[in-house]
A protein has these predicted regions:
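Pyridoxal 5′-phosphate
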Residues: 1-296
Length: 296
């Protein structure tokens, strides 16, 4: 093997660099069009238009409606808004997740249990895959939310999310037949998947979906929560009523614009990038096996 002459960064699952094209579109919102997007004068309307454009771009990438896109500060906030927001709107409700979720999901067990929302954690296989039937069997008549990440941030496993969604459809039908008037929502943390997997929400069968700019060559401090129309949930923050009342607080215009640009780039290059990474993964595996005999 040839010794590299410069550091090789291999932690893109933790944070990607900002793509130069993304940085370029963000720049003017720091020092030119910097007004509050809630303002009624010209600069404010320009900032609002930039947010609207980014919202439409992200909605299009998810095959969703612009009104279903909620901007947040990161995936952790999006996960918390999804889980706490739904549970707080349904007192005494139960929720289900898997043992391989991000800490921003699993760390909610104690505070949510203390608030009257018990959690069932479904184990995964030795390969890090959850069985969709195990998820379905963990659902009770008081379950209001199931949260299953799409791609894992540590080992990269992709969960059978559409299979989970199909089983939840059957459970909802059973509830309706038995006169149980309680929603059953499906949330997925797709922060690690956006650059590599088609995230059309109807195909996935989800009601809530988390995205994060810093995992797809966008800026840190930029997140999204997709919330399907009709989903009943409470906000975590109160104030000016931004994001249709879902998430109050002055919007981070440069970050939102950058996130929109990153999503657009990811959609355009997803197929080619996935093929490139697959080739690199194979090359790395072959070279390890050649350099370290007996490795498997």
């Amino acid at each position: 093997m040839t010794k590299p002459t410069h550091p090789i960064y291999l932690d893109n699952a933790a944070a990607t660099p900002v793509d130069p094209a993304v940085l370029e579109v963000m720049q003017k919102y720091f020092d030119q069009e910097y007004a509050n997007p809630s303002a009624l004068y010209g600069l404010g309307r320009q900032a609002r238009a930039a947010i609207d454009d980014a919202r439409a771009t992200i909605a299009n990438s998810l095959a969703a409606k612009p009104t279903e896109i909620v901007f947040t500060s990161c995936a952790t906030e999006s996960n918390n808004l999804a889980i706490q927001g739904v549970l707080r709107a349904h007192p005494g409700s139960h929720w289900v997740t898997t043992a391989i979720e991000h800490d921003s999901v699993l760390a909610l067990e104690q505070p949510m249990s203390a608030a009257g929302h018990p959690l069932s954690v479904v184990p995964v296989s030795a390969d890090g895959i959850v069985d969709a039937q195990d998820v379905a069997e963990a659902v009770t008549d008081t379950t209001v939310l199931v949260s299953v990440m799409l791609a894992n941030n540590e080992i990269g496993t992709i969960q059978p999310l559409t299979e989970v969604a199909k089983r939840l459809v059957a459970i909802r039908a059973s509830r309706t037949a038995r006169g149980i008037d309680r929603p059953l929502y499906l949330h997925t943390d797709a922060a690690q998947a956006a650059a590599y997997i088609n995230l059309h929400v109807n195909r996935l069968g989800v009601h809530l979906l988390t995205l994060n700019g810093s995992k797809m060559y966008g800026p840190k401090g930029a997140g999204v929560l997709y919330v399907r129309t009709g989903t009943i949930m409470n906000p975590l923050t109160y104030g000016g009523g931004q994001e249709r009342g879902r998430r109050s607080g002055t919007e981070n215009v440069p970050a939102i614009v950058g996130l929109g640009a990153a999503v657009k780039l990811a959609a355009a290059h997803r197929q080619a990038e996935s093929a490139r990474l697959e080739q690199l993964r194979g090359q790395l595996a072959r070279q390890i096996l050649e350099a370290l005999p007996g490795t498997s």
